[in-house]
Amino acid sequence: MVDVANIHLPVLLDDCVNLMAPALEHENAIAVDCTLGLAGHSIAFLKAAPQARLIGIDRDSEALGLATERMEREGLADRFIPVHAAFDQLDQVLADQDIERVDAVFMDLGLSSLQIDETDRGFSYSHDAPLDMRMDVSQPLTAERILATYDAAELVRIFKEYGEERFSRQIARAIVARRDKEPFTTTAQLNRLVDEVVPQAHRPAGNPAKRVFQALRIEVNGELDKLASTLPQAANRLHVGGRLVVESYHSLEDKTVKSFMAQGLRVDVPAGLPVIPPDAQPFFTDLTRGAIKADEHEIAANPRSASVRLRAVEVSREIPSRWRKRFTQTAQGLNDVKIQGSASPGRAKNTARIRTRRG
């Protein structure tokens, strides 16, 4: 049995609770944790907000089961609804629950400790494992398949775009040249190749393959495209006074979150107008004044928190209809949002329903 208490350390837990709890103080408040993992954050949210209910979404069925067991042990199961889905299915999840609006949405975009510490999915370059990298093992696309089928140009694209890898072209060419003789099936093989290609003098701190692993994981799971689709869904589902709280762990995620939130933090008129119409005023309030980072004490206790950036906004007024329409189009991939990587699970699966609504 997995000892979840030892492998899951929620990052910036107190900060996240302090940001979420004010939106959950009223009766029948509803929160959504789009990245449930092992429920470390969600358990704290429910304990801090005894009137709230929480929908926990995760595409990893193993994590979902373990999180549900934790909720039962904590006596919180009656206020918890587990849903097997990808987080970009947020609209569908809420529709299935007959919920129009919610009070808080949380996203922790890092890999769960369970996924990192399990050696059979290939998320970590520290262990030899199959090149899988799927968060949802029912999905068809794996890292092995990418390395076997993508041409050099496609590999260069994902290594450069998703890994910000300086030697993307050289690594891609080496993979294509070698794979016919030696198919890439394990993380050790990929580690060795990157080690051979990247010059010693130009290596980042840590394992030289970490950017390549990141790029493959993002491509396999469609992470950035799902994030770009989910953020506008979340905004459109929040009550006035509702909060969107997001933890990201690499610059591409943080840029996506920061850019999305900035849309609602600025005045929506051309510069120089003498009077700003009420409908053009910002509809978000910045709750974190930029990003909150882990301090040295948290990093010492949990090294995986070193790269975290926590951002949060509150919906300060009703989002204008033109922005709601724009957000809906973005969520559907109609505003230059690329949808790549693996498909989402066909339909959200849940075992319970929330029957109370906000009055």
Curated annotation (Swiss-Prot):
The UniProt record lists the keyword Methyltransferase: yes
Localization, UniProt: Cytoplasm
EC class of the enzyme, as a word: transferase
EC identifiers of the protein: 2.1.1.199
GO biological process, any: rRNA base methylation
Primary location class: cytoplasm
Gene Ontology MF: a single term: rRNA (cytosine-N4-)-methyltransferase activity
Chain residues that bind S-adenosyl-L-methionine: 39-41, 58, 87, 108, 115
GO cellular component, one term: cytoplasm
Alphabetical list of CDD domains matching this protein: AdoMet_MTases
Keywords, alphabetical: Cytoplasm, Methyltransferase, rRNA processing, S-adenosyl-L-methionine, Transferase
Known catalytic reactions: cytidine(1402) in 16S rRNA + S-adenosyl-L-methionine = N(4)-methylcytidine(1402) in 16S rRNA + S-adenosyl-L-homocysteine + H(+)
NADP among keywords: no
Residue ranges of the region described as Disordered: 339-359
Comp. bias intervals (Basic residues): 350-359
Recorded family membership: Belongs to the methyltransferase superfamily. RsmH family.
HAMAP family tied to this protein: 16SrRNA_methyltr_H
Function: Specifically methylates the N4 position of cytidine in position 1402 (C1402) of 16S rRNA.
PANTHER family reported for this sequence: 12S RRNA N4-METHYLCYTIDINE METHYLTRANSFERASE, S-ADENOSYL-METHYLTRANSFERASE MRAW
Name of the protein this chain belongs to: Ribosomal RNA small subunit methyltransferase H
Gene expressing this chain: rsmH
